[in-house]
Amino acid sequence: MKTSAYNVYLGVVAAMLALLFVTINAAPMEADDETAENTLVAHPDGDMELSGPWDAINTAALRKLLLQLDAEDRMGGVTRSWPQAEPRGWGLRALDSRLARQWRADKRQVRFRQCYFNPISCFRK
């Protein structure tokens, strides 16, 4: 009885080792070209002096871009969460000095939100 359990245990261990070796050999390895492309290359001394001011300019431009994108995301979230009132300036006026009307979808969205949060107010008499 002990020998058969021992043989089964050895068979399972041998099968696991064989599976491990097969997966190691079958796994794709990076070629030398790919490893050469992925390694970090140090700048020569001459390039470092020239790229110093450009790095600062690039960093400032990226920071400005990220701030603008973040502000646009926040403003987009505000306008999506609740429709804003019509602006009172001259920006949305048509040629004949009438205010340009907002989309009908905004009214539907307001009605949907009112009905969702206060369903009693949406019953028609």
UniProtKB/Swiss-Prot annotation:
GO terms for biological process: negative regulation of juvenile hormone biosynthetic process; neuropeptide signaling pathway. Residues 1-26 form the signal peptide. GO terms for cellular component: extracellular region. Its main location: secreted. The keyword Signal applies. The keyword Cell inner membrane does not apply. The modification Pyrrolidone carboxylic acid is found at residue 109. It is found in: Secreted. GO terms for molecular function: neuropeptide hormone activity. Residues 27-106 form a propeptide. Keywords: Cleavage on pair of basic residues, Neuropeptide, Pyrrolidone carboxylic acid, Secreted, Signal. Belongs to the allatostatin family. This is Allatostatin. The lineage of its organism: Eukaryota, Metazoa, Ecdysozoa, Arthropoda, Hexapoda. The gene is ast.
